[in-house]
């Protein structure tokens, strides 16, 4: 459970890092994580035939940047996140470590991005970090290549 809490801490760090004016300082950690929890009923009410909401795109970016940050902490390999989304909610996220692609996910219907619970959020984040870390361990020469 400690690793899950570590991921949630990394996620909160990313959310707060995107707040250049300090508007989120008044919110608790649980309030900042609440938008990441979207129940199945809530998900059904979200239309996918409209433009992507800026807040949803920011949450998606924060999540994958937290995965990259946690991977970097776990392995010491410098990571870079690339998120490409179109206005309709389709796109791709790629996380690199050196020259190694450690995560490559196709995204669709991101208007409905969220998790059923904060535990599921933490578990998904940790699973992605673990998978990326294993790739970096296996291909460490490529992951640490900065040329």
From Swiss-Prot:
It comes from the Bacteria. The keyword Protein biosynthesis does not apply. Pfam families: DUF269 (PF03270). Keywords: Nitrogen fixation. GO terms for biological process: nitrogen fixation. The keyword Chloroplast does not apply. Belongs to the UPF0460 family. NCBIfam families: NifX-associated nitrogen fixation protein. This is UPF0460 protein in nifX-nifW intergenic region. It comes from Frankia alni. The lineage of its organism: Bacteria, Bacillati, Actinomycetota, Actinomycetes, Frankiales.
